[in-house]
Amino acid sequence: MSNIEVATEKGYNKASLRKICADAGVTTGALYFFFEDKEALFGAIADGPYNELIAILKSHFEEDEALMEQPYDAEEGDHDAFVEELVHHLYQNYDVFHMLLTKAQGSKYENAVDDLADILDETYTKMSAKMGSHFGGKVNKQMVHWLTHMILDAFIHMITHEKDEKKALAHIKKVMNFITKGWTAVIDK
């Protein structure tokens, strides 16, 4: 059983370093040589994929913010390349992200969804303000926040309910087209 499997099965709080060491065929002393504690081991598993997720999102947001300099009219498939990259990353690291969403209580990642919501809220508020300036409207921050959670919830549902990457991609593309077309709803005219 791998470290990820132990953490996924038991969750961060209940994952035993002794069990992880026994399954890996090493002593706890050997583990502590490489990792200060369970948090460091968990970080070694999750930090890379999580940080790459943030980098993918930030890169996409930079592109979207540049688009918002001009009036933007959403078209079907506008975000397909981004969605494909994002879904592929999530599914290349499926066990890690499933663990972060369902078994991270007690770890530094227990608030990962809220942290992502904060990043999305900040970015979407800026983009909505730019979009609103083209329509002569004002951003409805509460609607931006709701939309942020709709998007996050769609991806959380995807990871927690669909193990097949191709099926997940087909469904989430439709969801993203729906959400992208609804962005004008966050502007009060």
Describe the residue ranges of each PLM region.
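Alpha-helical DNA-contacting segments of helix-turn-helix folds
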Residues: G43-P49, A112
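Amphipathic alpha-helical packing segments from all-alpha helical-bundle domains
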Residues: E85-Q92, G106-G132, Q142-H149
